[in-house]
Design a protein with these regions (language model features):
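Structured, active/binding-site neighborhoods that engage oxygen-rich ligands
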Residues: 1-324
């Protein structure tokens, strides 16, 4: 591939994150009725009063994952967790030297790891720990495994589950990450002739086939039924969509915005103007949108607001050179 798919995906994720930060936690009606109206581009402010172009925990944890992958030339679960600790404790992978907007499940897992140094037990396993904190950071692992021609699909899914499980170790969260990987894989292996909806459907079908081979997955699969048929999901009215921090809401809203729009810009603006967990849903959608439309589809004025853009570009270039 001539383009840098790492940059396509990661910059899509980071721009989506930064676009959503200023309106995070707001209801759709609150956003629309602001003095400035709906989101049209990068803004400052928000719950954490950050400068325009600031990425949050989504971008930081994705960058931490990518940094570990580049440095180790593979997925090293222990090192990924160490990178998360550097983010939490030292503010690494942030633009201003301090982590913010940390999710409860991620924080709990990180401090459990700091105490016990055990990657097998640090992740949260209860059903109430199915937020979107592993889905938001899984993209670098997905790209790496989509490029891997040697590892079996079963082992790839296990790796994705293990990366999720560092913080979110319930099957529902791991399955969401597995379906996200399947969509990334479909995007990177499409011939470019099919629609985005059809490519994502191909990926979802592949993921569902994998999970359908084990009856122990059947109950959890029922939570993903809206993704089974994207033609039907595309017909869903916005009032019937939810865009909160629950992993099911996040992946549904991200895919819905992708298949009901025709550009990266339109997709991300649609996401953030839905309200609620705007930064994370936009990061999840942005990663896929970036892979489909390419980094050149991101408005230049949006990119211009991202401080430390060069750091992201350099890290993605290192990844590109390692996996040509």
């Amino acid at each position: 591939m001539d383009r840098n798919i790492w940059l396509d995906g990661m910059m899509g994720l980071i721009v989506g994150d930064a676009l959503g930060v200023p309106v995070q936690f707001m209801e759709k009606e609150e956003i629309v009725t602001r003095e400035v109206g709906s989101v049209k581009g990068m803004e400052s402010g928000g719950a954490y009063n950050m400068p325009a172009g600031t990425w949050s925990d989504d971008g930081s944890m994705a960058l931490a994952t990518l940094d570990s992958i580049v440095n180790n030339k593979k997925i090293d679960l222990l090192d990924i967790m160490e990178c998360f600790c550097k983010w939490e404790l030292e503010g690494k992978y942030t633009q201003y030297g301090e982590a913010f907007d940390q999710g409860n499940t991620c924080t709990e897992a990180i401090y459990r790891y700091i105490k016990d140094k055990n990657i097998d037990t640090c992740g949260c396993t209860d059903e109430n720990s199915n937020g979107n904190g592993s889905l938001m950071r899984i993209l670098p692992a997905c790209i790496l495994l989509a490029l891997d021609e040697e590892t079996s699909e079963d082992d790839k899914m296990k790796l994705i589950h293990n990366v999720s499980g560092l913080t979110h170790n319930h099957l529902r969260s791991k399955m969401a990450c597995g379906l996200y990987y399947a969509m990334v894989d479909a995007l990177l292996h499409s011939e470019g002739e099919s629609s985005l909806k059809n490519i994502l459907q191909t990926g979802i079908d592949k993921g569902l086939k994998f999970y359908g081979m084990d009856k122990d997955n059947y109950y959890e699969m029922t939570h993903f039924t809206r993704l089974f048929h994207l033609d039907e999901l595309r017909q869903t009215e916005e009032r019937d969509m939810r865009s909160g921090g629950y992993v099911i809401e996040t992946i549904e809203a991200a895919v819905w915005c992708l298949i009901t729009t025709d550009s990266l810009k339109e997709c991300l603006l649609k996401v953030v103007n839905m309200g609620h967990d705007t930064d994370t849903v936009a990061a999840v959608a942005g990663g896929l949108a970036g892979l489909y439309y390419g980094v050149d589809a991101i408005p230049k004025d949006w990119l211009g607001e991202i401080t430390q853009e060069e750091y992201v570009e350099d890290l993605c270039e290192k990844a590109r050179l390692l996996w040509k």
